[in-house]
């Protein structure tokens, strides 16, 4: 505000792959991250199908699940779990069991790294924070896999593309955003 009062035009260029900034249509890097996560899910289809496995693909998104949602839909995940909607392990298993009964043989679960089980989400805020901080699992994918083992003997594998979602070459959409914004940037 102070700069604009001095006659300087100021704009903000959002730099987060999470696409979680209010007032923006799309943040820089979001679509590239979605493409990488989608490719991961797509590549896993073959091995999941040929070995009748449950694959849990953990995707970036600690507080919001936009990358997981878009990649899960585009990549053809069978179950998508987001931080905004606490999951019920019974419902996750029922979706897997239905696929088994329908002779699908495999299931791909796309889960955002910030997804939490319903029973944790229902705790009072202080207890919820403690439960999350004291979680013995290295990540949500491992917790989910361990919980699903109580329901099934089907082989469960985990794939975590991790920081590859933040790196690499930007896709055409993100390159367009970069080039469109170029005249507004100063060195």
Regions found by a protein language model. Name each.
Residues 121-124, 168-176:
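Short glycine/threonine-rich loop-to-helix capping motif typified by GTGT followed
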Residues 8, 13-20, 84-87, 113-116, ...:
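Short, ordered loop/turn segments at secondary-structure junctions
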Residues 9, 30-51, 58-154:
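Accessory alpha-helical/coil subdomains and C-terminal extensions
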Residues 1-7:
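N-terminal glycine-rich phosphate/adenylate-binding segment common to multiple enzyme folds
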Residues 19-25, 127-132, 168-171:
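Short beta-alpha connecting loops at secondary-structure transitions
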Residues 178-187:
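Single conserved hydrophobic/aromatic residue that forms the stacking wall/gate
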Residues 13-26, 49-50, 74-75:
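Acidic/polar active-site rim loop that often engages polyanionic ligands
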Residues 154-160:
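A contiguous binding-surface segment within folded domains or other stable secondary-structure elements
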